[in-house]
Amino acid sequence: MEFFEEIAKFRAARRIYAKILKEKFHARNSKSWHLRFHVQTSGESLTAQQVDNNVVRVALEAMAGVLGGCQSLHTNSRDEALSIPTEDSVKIALRTQQIIANETGVTKTVDPMGGSYYIEYLTAKIEQEVEKYLKRIGRMGGALAAIEKGFFQEEIRRNAYQLKKEIDDGKRTIVGVNKFQDAHDIEPQLNSMDMKIETRQIAVLKEFKRNRDKIKVDSSISQLQAAAQNENENLMPYILQAVKNHVTLGEISDTFEEIFGRYEPRVSF
């Protein structure tokens, strides 16, 4: 992660969002110009080697998100490169957020990095590059067309390859991986899963379905199906009503799949 670039990225996103709402959609309520976004620290940056180093990585990434203006934040756990995290690892991730929120003072000021020459330079540069991307996507016919053409997937794939190549070639330092390795790296204690969890959860789900009002469930699904076939209909009220009537996420997803089909990603090499 490039720390300052990460902060600038969020600031640029806020600028672009406000600009689009004002200039393209002519939104008049200034509150609608505010970009509200959630940040999750990077799973890609977590290493299987020297897992305690990941605590530092997560803390820096979380701080970048906060300085960039996020409204909510998830901090990954140090051992997620290896398995589902242990309770201790999750607690450290939580404490990381709490220390940032309560001990650093960064939450007392709106846009604390604003005015920094370097941050403002990066923010403007990222904004310009993003606008180029948006125009490029627009020429393709929009985001959906770009997905169908495999544009986003290819961009991610190319970037991932370039990053891996830089690490393998030693051009990008990853502490504990291609530099500052430890021949006696301590094997972390990993989470062990109780395989009976699946059986117990299936039983809970069956009991849940037995005790709900089947008439309301069927009615909610039928209304959702009808709404989904009308491209001008807002589906959110129907989804909320279905949830209130105890329709499961799986059933809602199955309803949409029946109408829209299942997305098959374009494979390219």
Q: What are these model-derived regions, one by one?
A:
Residues 10-14, 52-55, 88-92, 259:
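Short secondary-structure boundary/capping segments
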Residues 1-53, 135:
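Gly/Pro-rich turn-and-neighbor structural signature
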Residues 34-36, 69-72:
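Active-site-adjacent bridging/hinge elements
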Residues 31, 46-48, 71, 144, ...:
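Append "with occasional cross-activation on large, charged helical scaffolds in nucleic-acid assemblies
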Residues 13-14, 18-28, 56-69, 92-104:
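Structured alpha-helical segments in the cores of large, soluble enzyme domains
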Residues 27-29, 64-66, 136, 165-168:
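A general structural signal for short secondary-structure junctions and capping/turn motifs
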Residues 86-87, 95-98, 102-269:
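Flexible, glycine-rich loop/tail regions that form catalytic "lids" or insertion modules at the edges
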Residues 1-5, 39-52, 58, 73-88, ...:
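Short beta-alpha connecting loops at secondary-structure transitions
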